[in-house]
């Protein structure tokens, strides 16, 4: 059994580490990206942009309340771009990811990573102090026994 280990074999702060790891995994799971397959659904058999070249006629914009209710492409991301297919000349909507939304998700992720790093840095400092105290105590006992 390790020195300083509890009855169950984990150091005193071990349970806290397991809780933090579980919490971190839960956060990462909650931020899973939207699958590409669900980004666009059209009412026809297949959208023209899947099988032919297209030109973006209107950049990625947030959907209006009406578009959210009526256009299935708005459902997954809340953003849509208007495209024109080259061969068939059909105008369709295609779901897209907003640069602003991506930036927000990036900074949220970075904040979580920095927060987790700070927590674990504090845990390392606390553990190092515990080990230093134990080492000093051992040295003190050795000196007293002389």
UniProtKB/Swiss-Prot annotation:
Subcellular location: Membrane; Mitochondrion; Cytoplasm; Cytoplasm, Cytoskeleton, Microtubule organizing center, Centrosome
Coiled-coil spans in chain: none
Record keyword Membrane present: yes
Residue ranges that the UniProt entry lists as topological domain Cytoplasmic: 127-146
GO CC entries: centrosome; cytoplasm; membrane; midbody; mitochondrion; spindle
UniProt topological domain (Extracellular) ranges: 31-105
Main localisation: membrane
Transmembrane segments: 106-126
Any single biological process term in GO: apoptotic mitochondrial changes
Membrane topology (UniProt): Single-pass type I membrane protein
Annotated signal peptide: 1-30
Entries under InterPro entries matching the protein: JTB
Entry superkingdom: Eukaryota
Alphabetical UniProt keywords: Apoptosis, Cell cycle, Cell division, Cytoplasm, Cytoskeleton, Membrane, Mitochondrion, Mitosis, Signal, Transmembrane, Transmembrane helix
GO molecular function: protein kinase binding
Subunit-structure text: Interacts with AURKA, AURKB, BIRC5 and INCENP. May be a component of the CPC at least composed of BIRC5/survivin, CDCA8/borealin, INCENP and AURKB/Aurora-B.
Family in the record: Belongs to the JTB family.
Main function: Required for normal cytokinesis during mitosis. Plays a role in the regulation of cell proliferation. May be a component of the chromosomal passenger complex (CPC), a complex that acts as a key regulator of mitosis. The CPC complex has essential functions at the centromere in ensuring correct chromosome alignment and segregation and is required for chromatin-induced microtubule stabilization and spindle assembly. Increases AURKB activity. Inhibits apoptosis induced by TGFB1. Overexpression induces swelling of mitochondria and reduces mitochondrial membrane potential.
Protein's name in the database: Protein JTB
Originating organism: Rattus norvegicus
